[in-house]
């Protein structure tokens, strides 16, 4: 529409004066006045919207829509803008018409953007008049249409943006910062207000301060840590530690002892082990107080055995006799054998050693298995040869378990202890913890009697009371070659030295069950004879059919059935109590 008006006005101005052109000019002026009023309304709307939409001031930089798009009513092409100034130069009343359209057709980027916010019914896109055009295009006459165009010609202020409305904040006034507050961004407790030099102590200074002025909590932690360290250190070397001092003197290495103890822990006897250790500690204390001399003798014997049988067999016999005499006077161990029997299976040899001490204390300890075992083991000097040293170590382990057998209320318990290879190990360790484990054990393998011999001995043992100890000793520990000499020697020593082990078993059985324990004697003989599982099997055989040897031993030991039955009963009793 605007373009048509401009096109019409330009030829009229060029043609000259006439009635038709004058009427057209007046009509154009009226139309232009209406347009100005509409533009003023649009400007007001745009200003109000710009205040709200100023959040996107970058839109003002957008270019006007391309000329290819159909311009809305009132918009003129660039051609019209150029023709309008030319028309103003021509004299005549129609000069006004083209001048105003020129002013409104002048494109400006700001109105074009703001017009995009206009409602759809707004016909004009270019709503902002170019203020500078009136200077070039001539001012309108005041009489005709000066006032409305003048109002529209006043250049509107640029719409305010959000940035203009935002008040700048004075950070220094809001946050009272000072040079000393460089670290205030770090949290500082209200209770602790430091001066600037105290805020950044060096790590060394801080450590020095904390260490020089320890808190009560730190002191308590220090004391507890010291106590633990001292306890752990002393427990290693203390004779009351799980690994007794006698064990440390054994010829067997500590690694073997550890492996044996680990093997026990793998079994389901943890509770039993704990109880056994408690009993062992109490027994050791009682033993130390009541039998210091016995401990000296045992230590000397163990030392001699650690020296690989430097002492002669007679010395061993003497030690065993002395120990037995002392044992007779010792009070019985507080924990009875049935109590300890369960531990014999799964407890490390150190505990088995405590069980040996129990046997010593008990009135029947005269037949203390440890001494008896040691004596028969020591009898065969042949076993002390270097070739038999490995056997000796095994024998030591078997001997350790032997005290368990003596401790056992019945041969069944002893056999059960030795039934597993672990029990065999414990017996060996026990023997080694006893005296002369190394040399005695090596002799034992050579002295182990054949099953037939064992059977014969078992029968004899079962029928005979404690005095039969001597034949038991000779049979159990002496090899077939040495049997004659060993048996005679054992009888000479009254079973205390040579036949000490079988005798101790038999006597202890008498004390506990009142029945000779040929089973124990045979088992102990087998154990002493070899650090091999076979002796352990024989021991088990007395009451347990676990091992092949155990079964034949059973048959051999059958004559003393009352003893085996008692042992089985006791075995069941202690099992019930422990588990």
UniProtKB/Swiss-Prot annotation:
Expression tissues: Expressed in embryonic stem cells. Expressed in adult bone marrow, brain, kidney, lung, testis and thymus. Expressed in colon. Isoform 1 is highly expressed in brain. Isoform 2 is more widely expressed in bone marrow, brain, colon, kidney, lung and thymus.
Which InterPro entries does this entry report, sorted A to Z? Slain
Coarse class of the primary localization is: cytoplasm
Q: Where is the composition biased (Low complexity)?
A: 9-21, 141-154, 244-253, 289-305, 374-390
Biased composition, Polar residues: where in the chain? 233-243, 362-373, 412-432, 502-516
Coiled-coil positions are: 21-56
Q: Which domain of life is it from?
A: Eukaryota
Subcellular localization, per the record? Cytoplasm, Cytoskeleton
For the modification Phosphoserine, the affected residues are 241
Instruction: Kindly state which keywords UniProt assigns to this record, in alphabetical order.
Output: Coiled coil, Cytoplasm, Cytoskeleton, Methylation, Phosphoprotein
Q: Bias regions of kind Pro residues — which residues?
A: 63-73
Instruction: Sum up the protein's function in the record's words.
Output: Microtubule plus-end tracking protein that might be involved in the regulation of cytoplasmic microtubule dynamics, microtubule organization and microtubule elongation.
* PANTHER family assigned: NASCENT POLYPEPTIDE-ASSOCIATED COMPLEX SUBUNIT ALPHA, MUSCLE-SPECIFIC FORM, SLAIN MOTIF-CONTAINING PROTEIN 1
Q: How does it assemble?
A: Interacts with MAPRE1, MAPRE2, MAPRE3 and CKAP5. Interacts with ZDHHC17 (via ANK repeats).
Q: Which family does it belong to?
A: Belongs to the SLAIN motif-containing family.
**Stated name of the protein:** SLAIN motif-containing protein 1
Source organism of this protein record: Mus musculus
As recorded in Swiss-Prot or TrEMBL, the protein's gene is named: Slain1
